[in-house]
Amino acid sequence: MRVPININNALARVRDPLSIGGLKFPTTKEIQEAVAAIADKFNQENDLVDRFFPEDSTFASELELYLLRTQDAEQTGMTFVHQVGSTSLPVEARVAKVDLAKATWSPLAFKESRVWDEKEILYLGRLADEVQAGVINEQIAESLTWLMARMRNRRRWLTWQVMRTGRITIQPNDPYNPNGLKYVIDYGVTDIELPLPQKFDAKDGNGNSAVDPIQYFRDLIKAATYFPDRRPVAIIVGPGFDEVLADNTFVQKYVEYEKGWVVGQNTVQPPREVYRQAALDIFKRYTGLEVMVYDKTYRDQDGSVKYWIPVGELIVLNQSTGPVGRFVYTAHVAGQRNGKVVYATGPYLTVKDHLQDDPPYYAIIAGFHGLPQLSGYNTEDFSFHRFKWLKYANNVQSYLPPFPPKVEL
């Protein structure tokens, strides 16, 4: 995605731009002006997860989270995300402070940069003057868009991980964890995994489905009759959910009753897409659940493409479809003014100018400090039932086309 940004306009408004030879690179102030155009574009592309974790900020150095388990000291801490060639920020080992069911945690810090090294600078210097500005313009615009997109993906990863697992877990072998640190925050989500021994796509020797998806959710709703905090109101599914419904023999009976379409018999059959939609509509009406389909993908560090919500999994929302918490940005050092340290919150983009050093380089650094924070815990026992996780099928991938290798979607 390329965002049309004219860096030259920003440069023209600044009296003394950074320069080396005939090259002109933007300053932090100019970068921030250019970023405003990108930020507006990203704000118009709200993701589904933003609905459940609206952004917030605080200057507190720690966030209070409600937990049911004490975390070991060695589990605290997480590497700062960065690309090869960028400098890692120092990591502070901190013991979790536990008071009954509450705990405070230092926010996670993420940082990476786009670096123009000496080789690239020399290459740009060999370009004609009328070409240099256009090339630098294009590289800066693409880098800003790329860095901001990666920050949004990191935020999405944190929030989806909380909603899928009830915790944030960074393993030493994580491809984004070059320092090999281990980080675990358990949010104490009560019984997050719903039991389903036999999946919706399981069938017996006669080809009959083992579980009725509609009845399964109707039973969940009935069991929550006297526990409104546990009543399902919606589900968030990845790709393939409608395929599983269409192949479930229990759902096929509903379709046969309403539409007269009999699977496997010599009758007029609708296209597969029409049948899938009919099965999904029937599921919605008979369960009363809102079905949110989220089939977006991201590319992992190793080049593989993954779904944010893995195939065969879904998230059950209880009580309402409103926010389940906030994504809180915490303070970071934003520079110095009149000899005093300046603090700010939210994502940041700054310039690191070392064009006069040996070897020279120029970098745009992007990052943020923050964590998801849940709300809606029971005030008496700190139980939390706003969302649950369900593994509903084993063979959904067979319905989907394989991802081409190392393709960014």
From Swiss-Prot:
Xref: InterPro entries: Major_capsid_GpE
GO cellular component: host cell cytoplasm; T=7 icosahedral viral capsid
Keyword rRNA-binding tagged: no
Record's subcellular location: Virion; Host cytoplasm
Superkingdom as given in the UniProt entry: Viruses
This protein's UniProt keywords: Capsid protein, Host cytoplasm, T=7 icosahedral capsid protein, Virion
UniProt-listed Pfam families: Phage_cap_E
Major localisation: virion
Function: Assembles to form an icosahedric capsid shell with a T=7 symmetry although with a diameter of about 82 nm, which is a larger volume than the usual T=7 capsids. A dramatic reconfiguration of the capsid shell that expands the procaspid from a diameter of 66 nm to a supersized capsid of 82 nm, allows packaging of the large viral DNA genome. The capsid decoration protein binds the expanded capsid and stabilizes it.
The protein's name in its UniProt record: Major capsid protein
